[in-house]
Design a protein with these regions (language model features):
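Short, conserved active-site loops that position catalytic residues or coordinate cofactors/metal ions
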Residues: 43-45
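Catalytic core of pol beta-like nucleotidyltransferases
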Residues: 1-27, 35-41, 52-109
Length: 109
């Protein structure tokens, strides 16, 4: 029987720690191949990062990626507000719907 390929728990914990340190989000949802157990050698870790309040999305995203440098894993961060999650939770063409449906909450305040 073949084992499912998922993200290393220690790496995921470090990624979450670094994101929380920079962004102080309300919630982080892991989704994509890491949740499905289909990670390959070129897979990244997909994270929906939910943060409310006023902030410059581009600057905060950049700060998150800078802080993830050297973590040893490719990471794709999608930064959204709680209002966007509610507004687009049923929209098929956005990543929010599959992240909520199939993802795993890995951090919550």
């Amino acid at each position: 029987m073949r084992r499912k390929a998922t993200v290393d728990r220690r790496k995921l914990s470090e990624i979450i720690r670094r994101i929380v340190k920079v962004a102080a989000p309300e919630k982080i949802i892991l989704f994509g191949s890491a949740v499905r157990g289909e990670m390959g050698p070129n897979s990244d870790v997909d994270l929906l990062v939910v943060k409310g309040g006023k902030y410059n999305r581009s600057r905060l995203s950049g700060d998150i990626y800078i802080n993830l440098h050297g973590v040893g894993q490719a990471v794709d961060v999608i930064l959204v507000t709680p209002e966007e999650v509610e507004r687009y939770r049923n929209t098929h063409c956005l990543v929010i719907k599959p992240a909520l449906r199939d993802g795993k909450e890995v951090y919550r305040v």
